[in-house]
Amino acid sequence: GAFIMPGTLWCGAGNAASDYSQLGTEKDTDMCCRDHDHC
């Protein structure tokens, strides 16, 4: 599978979130990555 940074669902290749509102434990980092993924 794709590598996702620990503590995040959106940082890395693809994402591990089941829906857009879901975030990992590193929320600030994850929100930044999520914004990049949904440009």
UniProtKB/Swiss-Prot annotation:
GO cellular component: extracellular region
Pfam family membership, one: Phospholip_A2_2
Cofactor note: Binds 1 Ca(2+) ion.
Entry EC no(s): 3.1.1.4
Cell location: Secreted
GO molecular function annotation: phospholipase A2 activity
Chemical reaction(s) catalysed: a 1,2-diacyl-sn-glycero-3-phosphocholine + H2O = a 1-acyl-sn-glycero-3-phosphocholine + a fatty acid + H(+)
Names of required cofactors: Ca(2+)
Annotated catalytic residues: 36
Role description: PLA2 catalyzes the calcium-dependent hydrolysis of the 2-acyl groups in 3-sn-phosphoglycerides.
Membership in a protein family: Belongs to the phospholipase A2 family. Group III subfamily.
Protein name listed in UniProt: Phospholipase A2
Species name: Heloderma horridum horridum (Mexican beaded lizard)
